Design a protein with these regions (language model features):
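Glycine-rich active-site loop/strand segments that organize a redox cofactor
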Residues: 31, 45-80
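Short beta-to-alpha loop/turn elements within the nucleotide-binding domains of ABC transporters
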Residues: 38, 57, 98
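A short linear boundary/processing microfeature
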Residues: 50, 142, 180-181
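Short glycine-enriched loops at secondary-structure junctions
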Residues: 49-51, 131, 169
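Rossmann-like dinucleotide/flavin-binding elements
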Residues: 2-7, 11-37, 150-191
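Short beta-strands and strand-loop turn motifs
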Residues: 63, 97, 186-190
């Protein structure tokens, strides 16, 4: 269950930030390993199917590779394809479907324990993002089967009453998409 190689850096998370860190580690001739509990850019896969990013392509680029988009703001699918191409081009040492269980050690000498092995490393970068941690309201009923903390598609809600909590870009975009599909949308906004 142990890897004999000592890495200069272990990166937890294979999202855009984790990939960018791995690219830079490779360019600095640092031995590295990326450990991801899901798939490559796992959080982006959970985004709504036809989502358009609020950022321009330049703000999503990593490693100096251009993100070419057919639009001013890239679509989810274009962005996922882009990160997969960059990871293949850079031949990054990525271990998918491997969950980190714990980290032990001290500066310069860490052991990262996963559900498959233990990894010796001098440095650790935690690039896990925040998508897996929704902002729960801690209100009665939020754990019911029909309550969702992530928006994927609007089609299933056509002709139904839907409440969207929040007022930031993602909430507003979800409300618009739901409305266009015929849902009766109510937005709950703090303040």
């Amino acid at each position: 269950m142990s890897e004999s190689q000592q890495y200069d850096v272990a990166i937890v998370g294979a999202g855009p930030v984790g990939l960018a860190c791995a690219i830079e580690a490779g360019r600095q001739n640092l031995s590295h390993i990326v450990v991801e509990k899901g798939s490559l850019v796992n959080s982006l896969i959970g985004y709504p199917t036809n989502m358009e990013f609020f950022s321009t392509p330049e703000l999503l680029e990593i490693g100096g590779y251009p993100l070419v988009s057919s639009r001013y703001k890239p679509l989810r699918e274009e962005t996922i394809d882009y990160y997969h191409r960059v990871a293949r081009t850079e031949n990054l040492n990525i271990h998918l479907s491997e969950k980190v269980l714990r980290l032990e050690g001290k500066r310069g000498q860490f052991t990262l324990y996963t559900d498959k092995k233990s990894i010796q490393t001098r440095n650790v970068i935690v690039a896990t993002g925040f998508f897996d941690q929704p902002n729960l309201l801690n209100v009665e009923g939020e754990n019911l089967d029909h309550v969702h903390h992530y928006f994927k598609e609007a089609y299933a809600y056509s002709g139904r009453d839907v409440v969207v909590v929040g007022a930031k870009n993602s909430a507003a975009k979800a409300a618009l998409l739901l409305n266009r599909q015929g849902a009766n949308v109510t937005m709950l906004i703090r303040g």
